[in-house]
Structures are given as C-alpha cells and as structure tokens.
C-alpha cells in the first residue's frame, strides 16, 4: 500500500481489512471532533474511548502482517477514513482516494442506493445537538410509579414490586419523586430486559433516559449509541451513576429521585449498595 499523505491522492487498495480499519479511524476522528465541541454525551464518550482502544489494537496486529514501508499509524488512517466518508456521503469520486469506489457508484440501479445528493439537505440553521428534545418512545401499558414523601428504603421496595410485574421485552418507566425540601425530579426511562428461566431479570439494553425538573424543563438526557443501545449492562449502570452525579452538583442535598432511578435499574443486575447516609433513610 502506497503512502502519499502529503498529496490529495491516497491509495487505499483492494483489501477490505484496510478499508474497514481506515473507515473506523475516520469515525474516531468524527467522534473526537464532537468531543472537542462538547457535543458528546456519556455513552458517546465511552464509545469514543472503546473505539480508540480497539483500533489501536487492531492496527498493531494488522501492521505485523504488512511490509514495514507500508505500515500506517492511527493518525494517518484517520486522514484516509475522513476522505472515504466524503466519497460515501457525497458520492464524489474526486474526494481524494484512489482504489475506493462506492458500490452505489458502480451499481446505481440498485434500489438500496440513494438517488439524491446529501448536499441538497443542509443542516437547519440555529439548531444543534442540545436543541433536540425527544421523549422516550411509547410502549404498551407503561409503568408509572409515583413516590411522594416516601423514604428511600420504602421507595425502592415499591419500585422493585412494581417493576417485577413487567414482562420480558421493552419497558417505559416513569418515576415521579416529590419530597419536602428536595428538588423534585421526573425521570423517564426506556429499556429492555430479559427474564431468565429461574425468574431472575437482567437489564439487557438501555435505550434512553430523560430527566425533568419540577417545571418540566429537560435537565439531563441520555441517548445510548448503537441504535440506542448501551453495549453492556455494566456500562449502563456506570453511565447512569455518572449522569446523576452531575445532577447532584450544586445542591445542598442529593436529588433523591436520582438515587431512586439508579436503584430501579440496579434491580436488573448488580446489587445496589446503600451509602452510609442512605442506610438510615
């Protein structure tokens, strides 16, 4: 594979492995630029870090099978990957890559190929990622739990009883928490859980989470990656805890609804351990 990083023409070559690695590096570059703009949420940051580790490992392994003169670093592959995106998105063969031609350019009659130019659809002026406010999707017979003036121990027990009546599959859970002298918070959660033969349930995916203050204003949201799916259960718990820690900042007392919401999801996996402060409540 020729290395001409100082020109506009870069040979990608016919190998699908190189194409895949280079394109992944381009995706990583996009994630990093989003991160610089502070436009990535917690699962996005996790995805960035995991993708970088996987690419570094795969490049190291792949380079062992390449002649020394053709080995490329992650940064070099990022440049190629970004140009590959230009070819794919804008169907522009002059984007600067030789040896890489999109399938749709060679098979324009294929019904799965787009027949429009993406440049015809510029982004809407004045809108950015933070402006997007979507409610978690509706599901049949959603669970709604109202917890008013209830201590955390009783609240968790009520939640556990309510949630355990749910069937396998997707669920929507609304938690309304209102305690004297504590900021009220409404938490909407979408997720999917699996029921095992022994009756034990585990959270398999977390699709999205919105948190609203007492005036109905969206104060935090979590949209998971990969078709709205957190990749594993541990990630989901860690992301939620981090999210709610941010909500707690700046308040003299913890937001009990936040702790309650984390407790709900913890019923589908690892045991939720009470802090010393909570143990007496």
UniProtKB/Swiss-Prot annotation:
Region (RNA-binding and homodimerization): 1-93
Region (G1P2-binding): 1-103
Name of one Pfam family that matches: Flu_B_NS1
Motif (Nuclear localization signal): 50-55
GO biological process: symbiont-mediated suppression of host ISG15-protein conjugation; symbiont-mediated suppression of host PKR/eIFalpha signaling; symbiont-mediated suppression of host type I interferon-mediated signaling pathway
Keyword Repeat: no
Domain of life: Viruses
Keywords: Host cytoplasm, Host nucleus, Host-virus interaction, Inhibition of host innate immune response by virus, Inhibition of host interferon signaling pathway by virus, Inhibition of host ISG15 by virus, Inhibition of host PKR by virus, Interferon antiviral system evasion, RNA-binding, Viral immunoevasion
Subcellular location: Host cytoplasm; Host nucleus
SUPFAM superfamilies: S15/NS1 RNA-binding domain
GO cellular component: host cell cytoplasm; host cell nucleus
GO terms assigned for molecular function: protein serine/threonine kinase inhibitor activity; RNA binding
Coiled-coil zones: none
Endpoints of the signal sequence: none
Family named by the database record: Belongs to the influenza B viruses NS1 family.
Subunit structure: Homodimer. Interacts with and inhibits human G1P2 conjugation by UBE1L.
Record function comment: Binds and inhibits the conjugation of the ubiquitin-like G1P2/ISG15 protein to its target proteins. Since G1P2/ISG15 is an early antiviral protein, NS1 may inhibit the host antiviral response. Prevents EIF2AK2/PKR activation, either by binding double strand RNA or by interacting directly with EIF2AK2/PKR. Also binds poly(A) and U6 snRNA.
Identification of the protein by name: Non-structural protein 1
Organism: Influenza B virus (strain B/HT/1984)
